């Protein structure tokens, strides 16, 4: 597998991005890493690069404050655009970027393109509960149709089998305001009908926000606006809970003694919810394995993201296309 890495994308680029890519290259000797970036910024960091790392020159990064489409039109040599074109040409099989999320999505749609039968892509992220749950969409498609949510469920099911290594068919839930089939707005009710009728989906029914980590569903689908709000809320609540625990334990001598005794378990909890364990979120629905990293990704997060691509990305697009085609055949639909 060959992975194009946007070496200039992210708050800690290029140092942390390159360091993580080099660590992944050593960990995965059968994977070729194509670092994409300005030679003057990247080459000095490659003195000890293993043989499966190479540099592909590009212009600068798309900044976080830039409008993605306008930036790509005005600067087609931007690092994320060059990386996406490597996937389109077949020189790379996958793309990783920790830069501007909108730019990564736009470059993927513009240069790589959507897979057959998929009108809109979805960003899928793993919620690190005691029962890890795949949530999609978390930001690629803010406004959805019911058919899009069905497609997300199919994409997520295929991906969860590979990435989460679920036993049997992953159970899919529809994020809603209640468990009953008639709950929610028109979109939710129509999506519920389509999901319940699909032979490609093991539908578990509606799932409320409080049940995301309960194990009722392995995959939960929603529109990108709601999914992004859920993700950011979960991240904020996790940080606040850790802060409150730390404050309570360190506020007294007895608490500090207890904290010292519990330190290994507290660190294990902190590490469990650390997004660096996964390193990024897959953009499903495009003709390549695309992973969007966190803007503040460190070398550890980049390494884990590239390892995730190597584990789940091989043959992913072909399987997604085949599964969507079976759904279209079963429903009598032609491509969206």
Swiss-Prot record:
GO terms for biological process: fatty acid biosynthetic process; phospholipid biosynthetic process. Its main location: cytoplasm. It is an enzyme of class 2 (transferase). It is found in: Cytoplasm. One of its GO terms (molecular function) is phosphate:acyl-[acyl carrier protein] acyltransferase activity. It comes from the Bacteria. Catalyzes the reversible formation of acyl-phosphate (acyl-PO(4)) from acyl-[acyl-carrier-protein] (acyl-ACP). This enzyme utilizes acyl-ACP as fatty acyl donor, but not acyl-CoA. Homodimer. Probably interacts with PlsY. HAMAP family: PlsX. This is Phosphate acyltransferase. It comes from Rubrobacter xylanophilus (strain DSM 9941 / JCM 11954 / NBRC 16129 / PRD-1).
């Amino acid at each position: 597998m060959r992975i194009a890495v946007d070496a200039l994308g992210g708050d800690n680029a290029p140092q942390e991005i390159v360091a993580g890519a080099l660590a992944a290259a050593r960990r995965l000797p059968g994977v070729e890493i194509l670092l994409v970036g300005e030679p003057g910024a990247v080459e000095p960091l490659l003195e000890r690069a293993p043989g499966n790392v190479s540099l592909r020159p590009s212009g600068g990064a798309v900044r976080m404050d830039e409008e993605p489409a306008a930036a790509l039109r005005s600067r087609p040599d931007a690092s994320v655009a060059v990386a996406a074109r490597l996937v389109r040409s077949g020189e790379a099989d996958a793309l990783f970027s920790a830069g501007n999320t909108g730019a990564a999505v736009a470059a993927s749609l513009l240069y790589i393109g959507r897979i057959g039968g998929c009108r809109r892509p979805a960003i899928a992220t793993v919620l690190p509960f005691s029962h890890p749950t795949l949530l999609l969409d978390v930001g690629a498609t803010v406004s959805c149709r019911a058919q899009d949510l069905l497609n997300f469920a199919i994409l997520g099911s295929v991906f969860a089998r590979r990435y989460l290594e679920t036993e049997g068919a992953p159970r899919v839930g529809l994020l809603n305001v209640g468990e009953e089939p008639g709950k929610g707005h028109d979109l939710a009710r129509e999506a519920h009908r389509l999901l319940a009728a699909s032979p490609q989906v093991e539908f578990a029914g509606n799932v409320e926000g409080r049940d995301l980590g309960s194990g009722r569903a392995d995959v939960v689908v929603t529109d990108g606006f709601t999914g992004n709000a859920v993700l950011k809320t979960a991240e904020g609540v996790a940080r606040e809970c850790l802060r409150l625990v730390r404050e309570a334990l360190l506020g007294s001598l007895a608490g500090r003694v207890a904290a010292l005794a519990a330190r290994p378990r507290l660190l294990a909890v902190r590490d469990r919810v650390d997004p660096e364990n996964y390193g990024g979120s897959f953009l499903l629905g495009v003709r390549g394995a695309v992973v969007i990293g966190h803007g503040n990704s460190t070398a550890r997060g980049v390494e884990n993201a590239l390892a995730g691509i190597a584990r789940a990305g091989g043959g992913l697009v072909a399987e997604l296309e085949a599964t969507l085609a079976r759904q279209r055949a079963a429903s009598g639909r032609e491509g969206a």
